Amino acid sequence: MKYFAGEYDVAVIGAGHAGIEAALAAARLGCKTAVFTINMDAVGNCPCNPSIGGTAKGHLVREIDALGGEMGKTADECFLQSRMLNRGKGPAVHSLRAQIDRRKYSTVMKHKLELQKNLELRQAEIVEIEKTEDGYDLTTRMLAVFHCKTVVIATGTYLGGRIFVGEVSYESGPDGIFPASFLGASLKKLGLPLRRFKTGTPARVSRNSIDYTDLEVQKGDEPPQPFSYETESLGENKVDCYISWTNDETKQIILENIHRSPLYAGKIEGIGPRYCPSFEDKIMRFKDKPRHQLFIEPCGLDTEEMYLQGMSSSLPEEVQLKFYHTIKGLENCVIMRPAYAIEYDCVDPTAMLATLEFKDFPNLFGAGQFNGSSGYEEAAAQGLVAGINAALKVLGKSPLILDRAGSYIGTLVDDLVTKGANEPYRMMTSRSEYRLILRQDNADERLTPLGHEIGLISEERYQKFLNKQELKKQEIKRLKTTVISPTEEVNKILTERGTSEITTGVHLIDLIKRPQLDYKSLESIDTGRPKLDPNIFEQVEVEIKYEGYISKQLKQVEQMRKLENRRLPDDFDYRTIKGLRLEAQEKLNKIKPLSIGQASRISGVSPADISVLLIWLAQNK
């Protein structure tokens, strides 16, 4: 028999990376919050890669931290090795990536939820969700009913989860945890547009069964850089990673057994991630490629499990072992956990607003893989947005909408709700038109004032941020006014760096603008240089060197925001506008864009359609 068990302002279904950020944000904004999880030992679980960050993902983590989220701080607490990716490219694509202790990460996050004021962590499977006059009723498998003003669905890969390993298939969530078997039917009954996606994970092998003799060692950067602006130091890197390569023999085993892959045998219905394909998918798609790289990464300090990055598979366990044994270093490896594919239910994100609230279901929000994305960082970013907006809805305040020009989080959300996701969506720097101004080094500059305004950034942290901004301003002023004389020592340094000598005094800022020079190379002649946070030097140098490009991009942002400010009605039938093509009418009615800017990014809406909309707006002011 059902029984009434309590009520909350905000309820979060799922305690993965999205659910954690949503719950913490809502509770910190003063809302009575609950987060429900099938298994409390799986809070903040990292069922795939034992790492946080990476290309574009590192940007997201820095932005989450700048807004007042938790992922960056916890990643720093659990870090094993840190590396800055893409150092050989421009600063826009520099991305931090950290190996983490995955079990410690889960433990630390669970404890943070337990200690958070206004927040209750509950082990309970939500099996039913029903709309009420002022919110939603959630029913657990134990028949407890909770009344909630707002709900955030963050079910990850648990919703209708099914594992595939060769011919073997069974209902399960990741890491052998029970799936959410009943909630999907309730969501469909409610009217949410669900579909099936698929992802996968590589095997974990025993550290002691690996031969490291001929493997390439991949060390971390020294000193390692933290994600969080509040982390002062990480200490030293604690582990090494290793690189190996597949070969022709590996390829042959895959080709001989491809019929045993559930993906190629037609057993998996869900659409998989384009940018994180299974190893057998790589072999089939790139048959001419003689070898593929893989990374061997530790899962923690107190475990012997090693993760084989780049080797996701759904082939039978014995086939996995056979092809692993063809790889240098893995000739005698022992599988501790086999690779598997997992299929799960998720929603069409175009059913949501930019607040991540469902258009047709007020007070119901979605976040993470439930929204069709992939990755821990993408999930955490959406969880933060959904949790903030669920709380702001309860508090009767204006919602948080991040635009594409202000953050990668805004780009991620806009892509999902405007363009949708026909496959698991992965964040990449190439998805942003404004990546030169959306660098990870200036995430605090872009988002910390907003985090403070919302209420997630403390006054103490905000004052530190303002002080940093003042120091940066003073340093730029110093560089503009400091004159370097043409001495023998100065010209020797310039010649050694491959740039022309100076014959008259030159402002320091003009030397830094030269492509061959940077802050470090000018240290010996810059005698008045103050001791500042390296992050300040980094920001100053980038802004000086790329001033022209940044200025050009800021003008593009100005134009874009003019279109974003041309608001469209949210309850309008576009079939009534003459001149719009049929496809545009259908897409506009489905997406219900909030602005001309958003309408222009909808696939199937042409520039001619936008012109029609602009004329219609002018006529109907």
Which residue ranges define each predicted feature?
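Short hydrophobic core segments
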Residues: 13, 145-156
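Beta1/beta-strand and adjacent pyrophosphate-binding region of the FAD-binding site
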Residues: 4-18
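Conserved N-terminal/central alpha/beta ligand/cofactor-binding core
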Residues: 3-7, 24-132, 142, 154-174, ...
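Glycine-rich phosphate/pyrophosphate-binding beta-alpha loops
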Residues: 369-377, 433-435
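Internal hydrophobic alpha-helix adjacent to the cofactor/substrate pocket in enzyme cavities
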Residues: 379-400
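Extended, charge-enriched "interface" segments that sit outside catalytic cores
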Residues: 431, 437, 448-453, 457-609, ...
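A glycine-rich dinucleotide-binding beta-alpha-beta segment and adjacent secondary-structure elements
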Residues: 307-373, 401-414, 533-587, 592
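An anion/pyrophosphate-binding glycine-rich loop and adjacent beta-alpha core
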Residues: 39-41, 84, 184-321, 418-491, ...
